From Swiss-Prot:
This is Small ribosomal subunit protein uS3. GO terms for cellular component: cytosolic small ribosomal subunit. GO terms for molecular function: mRNA binding; rRNA binding; structural constituent of ribosome. Coiled coil: none annotated. GO terms for biological process: translation. It comes from Maridesulfovibrio salexigens (strain ATCC 14822 / DSM 2638 / NCIMB 8403 / VKM B-1763).
């Protein structure tokens, strides 16, 4: 039976770049754990800002975060007040110096992570899962996605037995390395239990094989 490899891990160094970029010979496990803690902390603090991914770079004891968000204004705040507050909160919690950079996501409708989280929020508001999936798929296609696949797994519509249902529109070539596949996962905590959501979005082919910056 065929299994699906993670679309990012499959393309690392070819068309995708690492989200954590640093080198360490001794403190590697501690840094990996710290990176995960930083991402969770930032995501919780600014969840309402539509954060897709957080890149982490380390150099000389200083940590640089690149936050990809659909609403940069919420993170930065008036005259940079909010981003400065976030930087100070990070410094106090992790006892390290941080440099924060905000990158705007121009089309959140074609960002897989934001799409997955959007579906999760709809399911938690008791929107029918098929309606939520079809609406999201239509939006992504309207905003330029060449293909999209959405999968929901769990006690869908309160069913006794958990199952997986998926919906696809367009082309999603997971085995083509030059295909620019965006991938996102989210979980919806409903009254019937947890529902897992996975989203694959095909944005076109990268023909020059340059790793994304």
């Amino acid at each position: 039976m065929g299994q699906k490899v993670h679309p990012y891990g499959f393309r690392l160094g070819y068309t995708k770049n690492w989200l954590s970029r640093w080198f360490s010979s001794k403190d590697y496990p501690a840094f990996v754990y710290e990176d995960d803690s930083i991402r969770k902390y930032v995501k919780e603090k600014i969840f309402h800002a539509g954060v897709s991914k957080i890149e982490i770079e380390r150099a000389g004891g200083k940590i640089r975060l690149i936050i990809h968000t659909a609403r940069p204004g919420i993170i930065i705040g008036r005259k940079g007040v909010e981003i400065e507050k976030l930087r100070e909160d990070l410094r106090r919690k992790f006892n390290k110096e941080f440099a924060l950079e905000v990158s705007e996501i121009r089309r959140p409708e074609t960002d897989a992570q934001l799409v997955a989280e959007n579906i999760a929020q709809q399911l938690e508001r008791r929107v029918a899962f098929r309606r939520a999936m079809k609406r999201i798929v239509g939006l992504a296609r309207k905003f330029g996605a060449e293909g999209i696949k959405v999968a929901c797994a769990g006690r869908l519509a309160g069913a006794e037995i958990a199952r997986t249902e998926w919906y696809r529109d367009g082309r999603v070539p997971l085995q083509t390395l030059r295909a620019d596949i965006d991938y996102g996962v989210a979980r919806a905590n409903t009254t019937y239990g947890v529902i897992g959501i996975k989203v694959w979005i095909f944005k076109g082919e990268i023909l020059d094989h340059e790793v994304e910056q």
